[in-house]
C-alpha cells in the first residue's frame, strides 16, 4: 500500500486524507455518549443535546462528502458524478433527522429557524450543482460556507442544552474533543478532499493550487494537535476515559501522521 501511495499525486493524497477524516471522527464520538454519561452523571438535557449534535455532525460529514463529489463531478469526473445523487439523498434525510430531533427535544426557536433556513440554502445549492450551473471552485466555496453555518448551529445546541458549561473538567474536555475539535479537524481534511478531487478531475495542479493545498496541510496539523490536546486533558484525571481513549487516540495520531508524511 505504501508504494502505491507514494506513486499517487499530491491531489490524490489529499483525497485520501479527506476519506480518512470521515472514518476517524467516529472514534471519539462513539465513545463519547457511552463514557460521558454512564452513571447518569450528566443532566438529561445534556444527553439530549449530545444526541442532537450527533445528528448535526452527521449532516456536516455528509455535506463534506457531497462537497468532494460535487467538485469532482463539476471538474469532469464521471464516476463521482454517478455517486453524487445518493449522497444528496442521504443529506436530505439527515436534515430531516435533525429537524425531528430539534422538535422532539424542544430546542430553542432560534435554533429551529436557523436549521430551516440552512436547509433552504442546501436545497438551492444542490439544485445548482445537479444542473451544473456552478464551476467546481464556486461549488466548493458555497459548500464550505454552508458547513460553517451548520457549525454555528451546533455551537448554539452546545450552549442551549448546557453542554458548554459542564463543571466537570473531564467530561467538558471530552465534549469539546468529541463533538467540536474532531469535527473541525475533519472539516480541514474535507476541504483538502474537495480540492484534491477538483484538481484530479482537471488533470492539473497549478502552482497556486499546490500552495493552497500546502496551506491547508498546515491547518490540518494544527487542528490535529488541538484535538489531541483536548483528549489528553479529558484523560488526565479520569482512568475510565484514559483506558478507552488512549489506544484509539494514539492510533488516530499515527494514521494521520503517516498520511501527512506522504504529501
Residue map of PLM features:
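Hydrophobic alpha-helical segments
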Residues: 2-263
Amino acid at each position: 500500500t505504501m508504494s502505491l501511495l507514494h506513486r499517487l499525486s499530491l491531489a490524490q493524497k489529499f483525497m485520501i486524507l479527506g476519506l480518512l477524516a470521515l472514518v476517524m471522527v467516529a472514534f471519539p464520538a462513539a465513545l463519547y455518549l457511552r463514557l460521558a454519561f454512564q452513571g447518569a452523571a450528566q443532566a438529561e438535557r445534556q444527553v439530549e443535546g449530545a444526541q442532537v449534535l450527533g445528528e448535526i455532525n452527521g449532516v456536516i460529514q455528509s455535506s463534506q462528502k457531497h462537497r468532494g463529489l460535487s467538485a469532482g463531478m463539476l471538474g469532469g469526473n464521471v464516476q463521482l458524478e454517478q455517486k453524487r445523487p445518493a449522497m444528496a439523498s442521504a443529506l436530505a434525510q439527515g436534515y430531516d433527522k435533525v429537524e425531528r430531533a430539534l422538535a422532539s427535544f424542544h430546542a430553542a426557536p432560534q435554533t429551529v429557524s436557523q436549521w430551516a433556513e440552512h436547509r433552504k440554502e442546501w436545497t438551492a445549492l444542490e439544485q445548482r450543482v445537479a444542473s451544473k450551473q456552478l464551476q467546481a471552485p464556486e461549488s466548493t466555496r458555497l459548500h464550505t460556507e454552508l458547513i460553517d453555518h451548520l457549525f454555528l448551529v451546533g455551537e448554539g445546541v452546545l450552549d442551549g442544552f448546557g453542554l458548554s458549561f459542564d463543571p466537570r473538567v473531564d467530561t467538558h474536555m471530552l465534549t469539546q474533543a468529541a463533538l467540536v475539535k474532531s469535527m473541525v479537524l475533519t472539516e480541514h481534511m474535507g476541504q483538502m478532499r474537495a480540492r484534491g478531487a477538483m484538481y484530479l478531475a482537471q488533470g492539473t495542479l497549478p502552482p497556486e493550487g499546490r500552495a493552497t493545498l500546502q496551506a491547508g496541510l498546515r491547518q490540518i496539523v494544527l487542528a490535529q494537535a488541538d484535538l489531541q490536546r483536548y483528549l489528553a486533558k479529558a484523560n488526565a484525571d479520569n482512568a475510565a476515559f484514559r483506558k478507552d481513549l488512549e489506544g484509539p487516540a494514539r492510533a488516530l495520531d499515527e494514521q494521520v501522521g503517516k498520511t501527512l508524511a506522504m504529501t
